């Protein structure tokens, strides 16, 4: 249903707008996008987001945009290819239902700061078993078993921050390099991470780029078309992951939990196209081993579609 709404919005051809203050987007993660017959670990995720430009003042030396956003989403986690035998499980079965609110500050020097809070629910209350089994039955996929071992219900709250800064841009304007860092502290994910981001192609300044959701503009501003490839390796030091370790505050976290690998390298390679109202992004993500078990490294694909108005 959500995809149909977005396709209708994209197909709509209205009069040219002198400002775009709002954006709706849908984001989908799935290891099936890799076409390697894999259905395991972080196996599916979907989220819907709304962003609004709330303030733009480019008159000051440290001119900036302010954009706030909200996101609701759902994630599914399985053991290796859905194995139900307890002895073969290398990751907990669980689902995560969440909502997030954030605010971003984007500066003329092409640095940015994003602060947010996320509240979520793990366990049966996140409806992972019903959603996954219903989807598999609808499309005639294999039978899922193992949800009887899922993590216990628990609520999480995280505070998150992300900072990025432009390091250099080529004289042609077709290549740039930025440094990005992120941090999360809470009951779900606690980590710190940092790494470079390389972009190649037709680029906008980072305060008007799809890369950080800043293409929204008021009257008198022009945001050009973008078309670029990007590569983002980021090294994380991880303190807690509730999808693997269970509820931090629970004594009985569930029948299957594991410890986490503290160091993880996450690499993303992708392509973005953005023009007028529409933004489309597709990327692949490759993570090194996350779980202290027989679980292997994991990878998945992502697709995002946004419509600004």
Could you tell me what each predicted segment is?
Residues 1-21, 309:
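Bacterial Sec-dependent N-terminal signal peptides
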Residues 16-21, 56-64, 208-224:
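Outer-membrane beta-barrel biogenesis signature
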Residues 17-29, 66-74, 179, 227-233, ...:
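Transmembrane beta-strand segments of Gram-negative outer membrane beta-barrel proteins
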Residues 20-59:
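N-terminal ordered "arm"
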Residues 24, 72-218, 229, 240-259:
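Outer-membrane pore/translocation modules
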Residues 34, 81-83, 203-309:
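Outer membrane beta-barrel transmembrane domains
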Residues 44-53, 100, 159-165, 192-202, ...:
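Feature captures outer-membrane beta-barrel proteins of Gram-negative bacteria and organelles
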Residues 48-79, 116, 121, 276-279:
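Glycine- and aromatic-enriched membrane insertion/assembly motifs of diderm outer-membrane
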């Amino acid at each position: 249903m959500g995809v149909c709404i977005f396709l209708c919005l994209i197909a709509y051809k209205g009069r040219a707008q002198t400002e775009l203050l709002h954006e709706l987007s849908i984001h989908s993660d799935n290891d099936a996008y890799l076409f390697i017959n894999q259905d395991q670990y972080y196996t599916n995720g979907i989220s819907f987001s709304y962003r609004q430009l709330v303030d733009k003042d480019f008159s000051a030396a440290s001119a900036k945009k302010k954009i706030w956003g909200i996101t609701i989403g759902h994630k599914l986690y399985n053991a290796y290819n859905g194995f139900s035998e307890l002895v073969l499980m290398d990751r907990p079965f669980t689902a995560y239902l969440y909502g997030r609110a954030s605010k971003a500050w984007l500066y003329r020097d092409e640095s940015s700061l994003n602060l947010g809070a996320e509240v979520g629910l793990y366990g049966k209350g996140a409806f992972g078993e019903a959603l996954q089994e219903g989807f598999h039955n609808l499309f005639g996929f294999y039978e899922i078993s193992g949800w009887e071992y899922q993590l216990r219900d628990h609520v999480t709250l995280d505070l998150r921050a992300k900072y990025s800064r432009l390091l250099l841009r080529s004289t042609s304007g077709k290549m740039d390099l930025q440094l990005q860092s992120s941090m999360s502290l809470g009951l779900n994910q606690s980590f710190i991470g940092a790494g470079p981001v390389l972009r190649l192609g037709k680029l906008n300044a980072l305060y008007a780029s799809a890369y950080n959701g800043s293409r929204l503009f008021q009257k008198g501003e022009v945001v050009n078309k973008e078309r670029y490839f990007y590569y983002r390796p980021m090294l994380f030091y991880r303190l807690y992951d509730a999808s693997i370790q269970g509820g931090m505050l629970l004594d009985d976290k569930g029948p299957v939990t594991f410890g986490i690998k503290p160091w993880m390298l996450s690499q993303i390679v992708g392509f973005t196209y953005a023009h007028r109202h529409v933004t489309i992004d597709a990327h692949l993500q490759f993570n090194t081993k996350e779980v202290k078990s027989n679980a292997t490294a994991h990878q998945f694909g992502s697709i995002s579609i946004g419509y600004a108005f």
